[in-house]
């Protein structure tokens, strides 16, 4: 396996995990703070995906911290494959949650013009943080996937 910055067990990898956790936690907190998120299934789905993202990122961040503290290499084929599959699934689920919530937010804001009755700024912030979470997860997935693909041949 190639030693790339951002791979599991590196400071760059830990930094990406912390960013993922931060963006997901902000999205979760902002959306949960709105009174009427439970009435819209797309907003509930965004909350579910951000909880999944928080759990995944926190777990992998703890593994990264442990690997950095004991100076253990996490770049073996089995571990990187596990991280790549987890990152890929989590990325797709998080992206679908952010897209679904974005669609409803645009509907409420631009099409129905109901922002006076709804906390549109909170919805938009939660959706933006959901997308930022996805964008910060993508490098982790791509680096792990590239590492697997390049070591196979």
Curated annotation (Swiss-Prot):
Residues 1-10, 71-87, 147-153 are cytoplasmic. Disulfide bonds: none annotated. It is found in: Cell membrane. Keywords: Cell membrane, Membrane, Transmembrane, Transmembrane helix. Residues 32-49, 109-125 are extracellular. The keyword Repeat does not apply. The keyword Repeat does not apply. The chain crosses the membrane at residues 11-31, 50-70, 88-108, 126-146. It is a multi-pass membrane protein. GO terms for cellular component: membrane; plasma membrane. It comes from the Eukaryota. Homodimer and heterodimers. Belongs to the Casparian strip membrane proteins (CASP) family. This is CASP-like protein 16. It comes from Zea mays.
């Amino acid at each position: 396996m190639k030693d790339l910055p951002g791979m599991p067990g590196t400071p760059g990898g830990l930094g990406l995990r912390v960013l993922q956790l931060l963006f997901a936690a902000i999205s979760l907190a902002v959306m949960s703070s709105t009174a009427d998120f439970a009435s819209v299934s797309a907003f509930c789905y965004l909350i579910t995906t951000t909880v999944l993202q928080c759990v995944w990122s926190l777990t992998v961040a703890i593994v990264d911290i442990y690997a950095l503290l004991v100076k253990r290499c996490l770049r073996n084929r089995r571990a990187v494959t596990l991280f790549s599959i987890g990152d890929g699934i989590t990325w797709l689920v998080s992206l679908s949650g952010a897209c679904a919530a974005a669609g409803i937010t645009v509907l409420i804001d631009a099409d129905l013009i109901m922002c006076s009755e709804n906390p549109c700024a909170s919805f938009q912030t939660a959706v933006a943080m959901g997308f930022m979470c996805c964008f910060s997860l993508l490098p982790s997935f791509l680096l792990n996937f590239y590492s697997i693909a390049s070591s196979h041949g």
